[in-house]
């Protein structure tokens, strides 16, 4: 007969689906339900506990980590006499903390563009439907400027912080960097360098979306986070134009962090 679903039933479901328990290279650091189904699978549930059913199934997300990585930190923890080490996927944590439960009822796209690495994830329920990472970020904008103008990286970083892609510059416009404006850069050239790098980042985001299998139409927003390009004025609008999708910057709903 039907019985109420309990924590033990959910735990058993997660255990049955984990095929990485004895994997030589990877270990599971988290398992999260995208959704649950009961009996005839005609309905999806976010929370099945307490519901009477004969059978529970579901789509579960397993987050993996290389054993070489976990072994390193477990040895450090052992030396420090720490009893336990917990590993958390950063983009999973972003999805859970920055997107409301109502939004996560449907699949959502997060693009975390960092300084030198970026990730694109499809989030649903309490899990990740897909995750792609690539070695590109806002730091590459500064690197391109330093290389093209043959200036110190510190000066290129300073210029990057002044970029404004929303303004219409002319040939007389310039950015300054260094002590007493030691370095001058054509604003037109700097902006073109930044746009070129953003084009590449947008291309990788598009490829990641395609690989995920998520059918994201022109009205499907891309939630942008990370400090790589969100601080570049006009970058959000430019990426939206290139990707042909609305871009929304998301940040923690905490004073001084919600910008």
What are the functions of these language-model segments?
Residues 1-14, 144-147, 151, 256-258:
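N-terminal phosphate-binding loop and adjacent alpha-helix
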Residues 62, 67-75, 92, 124-203, ...:
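Phosphate-binding glycine-rich/basic clefts of nucleotide- and phosphate-handling proteins
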Residues 100-102, 230-240:
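Short glycine/threonine-rich loop-to-helix capping motif typified by GTGT followed
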Residues 210-215, 222-225, 248-254:
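Hydrophobic alpha-helical bundle architecture
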């Amino acid at each position: 007969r039907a019985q109420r679903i309990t924590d033990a039933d959910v735990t058993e479901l997660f255990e049955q689906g984990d095929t990485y328990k004895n994997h030589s290279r990877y270990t599971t650091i988290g398992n999260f339900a995208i959704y649950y189904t009961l009996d005839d699978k005609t309905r999806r549930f976010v929370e099945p506990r307490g519901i009477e059913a004969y059978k529970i199934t579901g789509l579960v997300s397993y987050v993996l980590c290389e054993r070489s990585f976990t072994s390193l930190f477990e040895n450090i923890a052992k030396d420090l006499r720490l009893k336990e080490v917990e590993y958390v996927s950063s983009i999973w944590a972003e999805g859970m903390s920055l997107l409301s439960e109502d939004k996560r009822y449907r699949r959502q796209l997060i693009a975390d563009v960092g300084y030198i690495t970026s990730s694109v994830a499809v989030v649903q329920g309490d899990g990740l439907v897909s995750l792609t990472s690539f070695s590109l970020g806002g730091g590459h904008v500064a690197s391109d400027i330093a290389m093209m103008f043959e200036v110190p990286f510190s000066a290129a970083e300073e210029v990057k912080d002044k970029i404004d892609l929303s303004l219409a510059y002319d040939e007389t416009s310039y950015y300054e960097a260094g002590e007493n404006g030691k370095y001058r850069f054509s604003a037109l050239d700097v902006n073109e360098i930044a746009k070129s790098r953003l084009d590449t980042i947008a291309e990788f985001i598009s490829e990641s979306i395609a690989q995920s299998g998520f059918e994201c139409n022109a009205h499907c927003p891309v939630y942008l986070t990370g400090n790589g390009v969100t601080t570049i004025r006009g970058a959000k609008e430019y990426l939206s134009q290139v990707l042909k999708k609305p871009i929304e910057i998301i940040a923690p709903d905490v004073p001084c962090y919600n910008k």
